[in-house]
Amino acid sequence: RVKTGIANRYMRPILGVLDPENTRTCPKEVAASAGLDVLSHALESFTALPFLCRDKPERPSMRTAYQGSNPISDVWALEALRVVAEFLPRVFQNSDDEEARGRMLLGSSYAGTGFGNAGVHLPHAMAYPVAGQVEGYLPAGYNADHSMVPHGTSVIVHTPAVCRFTAPSAPERHLQAAAALGADIRDASPDDAGEILAERVIHFMKLMQQPGGIEDFGYSEADIPRLVDGTLVQARLLKLSPLKTGAAELTELFRNSLRLY
């Protein structure tokens, strides 16, 4: 009972149609979860293991689909974060705000272009078992007849703990991401990077009225071992963590995601 993803360069589309009319009747809860997924897509691709740290293939055509953070994906990721910071709250407050819905569609595509090359890492890896093993949780706004955690919600609930964990790998990049999300980093030190970025993510989670931890889905400390087991099989994503992440690290990350606020 673990969600997973399938990725291959042959699955990439050649055309995308971004029409805000298609999202006009989207419930605000769905817009919130999807928008926070955009946030984490961009944040994870920007903080992923740098592409130069990946094993070099025999020839360029054999590179993995997810290559790690790189200068081109960075451009898309940072702009996506800026778009989310400005327009996601507007979409949540007013579904008739066509400019905001259109800009969020663009922001989603920016983030997708970035992580489609760089990849995502720990928040998504941790989200898969949380979404796959949930029992008895029915999210507002989804008209669901079965237990489910919306994808973006299952991702973002782990992002603050991961930010605090990964910040020592590249404090300046984490501060850049926080600034793109609207944080004031003028007096910030490298040691502050993880906390500043985590708190900025939590700020948007609260604005979007998101659950404050995986306890809200019904999970407890006793469930952490099986959630860790479900994460360890996500090798494609774990390889992109900027820091070595095994069972011990995941255990602590899940523990820190039980209750954020």
Question: Where would I find each of the regions flagged by the language model?
Answer:
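A glycine/threonine-rich phosphate-anchoring loop and its flanking beta-alpha core
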Residues: R1-A65, S169, L175-Q176
